[in-house]
From Swiss-Prot:
<dbReference type="InterPro" id="IPR020103">
    <property type="entry name" value="PsdUridine_synth_cat_dom_sf"/>
</dbReference>
<protein>
    <recommendedName>
        <fullName>tRNA pseudouridine synthase D</fullName>
        <ecNumber>5.4.99.27</ecNumber>
    </recommendedName>
</protein>
<comment type="similarity">
    <text>Belongs to the pseudouridine synthase TruD family.</text>
</comment>
<dbReference type="GO" id="GO:0031119">
    <property type="term" value="P:tRNA pseudouridine synthesis"/>
</dbReference>
<dbReference type="InterPro" id="IPR011760">
    <property type="entry name" value="PsdUridine_synth_TruD_insert"/>
</dbReference>
<dbReference type="GO" id="GO:0005829">
    <property type="term" value="C:cytosol"/>
</dbReference>
<dbReference type="GO" id="GO:0160150">
    <property type="term" value="F:tRNA pseudouridine(13) synthase activity"/>
</dbReference>
<dbReference type="GO" id="GO:0003723">
    <property type="term" value="F:RNA binding"/>
</dbReference>
<keyword id="KW-0413">Isomerase</keyword>
<dbReference type="Pfam" id="PF01142">
    <property type="entry name" value="TruD"/>
</dbReference>
<feature type="domain" description="TRUD">
    <location>
        <begin position="159"/>
        <end position="302"/>
    </location>
</feature>
<feature type="active site" description="Nucleophile">
    <location>
        <position position="84"/>
    </location>
</feature>
<dbReference type="InterPro" id="IPR001656">
    <property type="entry name" value="PsdUridine_synth_TruD"/>
</dbReference>
<comment type="function">
    <text>Responsible for synthesis of pseudouridine from uracil-13 in transfer RNAs.</text>
</comment>
<dbReference type="InterPro" id="IPR042214">
    <property type="entry name" value="TruD_catalytic"/>
</dbReference>
<dbReference type="InterPro" id="IPR050170">
    <property type="entry name" value="TruD_pseudoU_synthase"/>
</dbReference>
<keyword id="KW-0819">tRNA processing</keyword>
Amino acid sequence: MDLVFRPERYPFLTQDLPGVGGEIRVEPEDFQVEEVPAYLPKGEGEHLYLLLEKEGRTTREVLEFLRDEVGVPEKEIGVAGLKDKRAKTRQWFSIPRKYEDALCLLENLQGVRLLAADLHTNKLRTGHLKGNRFHILIRRPKGGVAEAEAVLKRLAEKGVPNYYGPQRFGLGGLNPVRGYKLVKEGKGRGSPWLKRFLIGSLQSLLFNDWVALRMALGLYDRVVPGDWAKKHATGGEFLVEDPGEAERALRLEISATGPLFGKKYPEAQGEARAIEDEVLARYGLKREEFRARRGARRPIRVPLAEWKVEEAPEGLWLSFFLPKGSYATSLLREVMKVEALDHLEAEPAPEDAEGL
């Protein structure tokens, strides 16, 4: 029974296509992320939205500065998602309008720049984003534009495997082991947030195993009766009863969803449920052992949009858009076929915290 997260245990969708190799995040500006908001501020209201560009700073560090130096109570600071430290990122924050005069203090926070500010009627909430645009440099690649484009074309046709990335599993990928102990014993040291996060790591490992099993069974881009499927255009979920829905899955209009086991999530039926049970049985786990968690369903794949590859003297630039909750590393591992990139440190994004 191996509960340690190891990226090599998960198959590539593009196994038959060569990777380009190379390195990422040699410099922070090699990894650029732009948050795409679910909505823009209206220009009126009691909440001030701030578009910040940061480099070499975690989102948490910015939150703490707004709290400690600007004086905003932490519960009144809004953020849609967390962004990596070793990257150049643009994201929105919100604070109450009454703190507007203190924003000049942001000039004292090295690595952070205020790009825009506007008013809105509500606080920015976790998950209030469409997704993220990425602009990533692969340095010293062995392959070229043609190899990268072949992989991205396949991913655009079939969808990007929605594996959880290394951010979810902690140093050495050991958090699922700690989460398993909490599930089995029902107690342990640490704050409630830490316990939720550790059990969330176990939920995520089980989900990744489910994705890999569906691939092995030839059901990655299929749905079967009993599946809960997600409509990519609207986000709605429904129970698959008509075998004819398989055609919509092949067109990437819908995708099967996998479980983040808990007490409040739609449960699969029939063959689809049996696949989930097989993953649980590997570790001697039962559904009822996750009743302390909320639970959710997560699509097996996500659409890839706005993708492009450009050659530069320093390497290959990849540009693409992914929906919220998905991981750029899941795409990069397909393009590069280099597992070492999955061990990069990054910050877990709260929009990925469904089911905790």
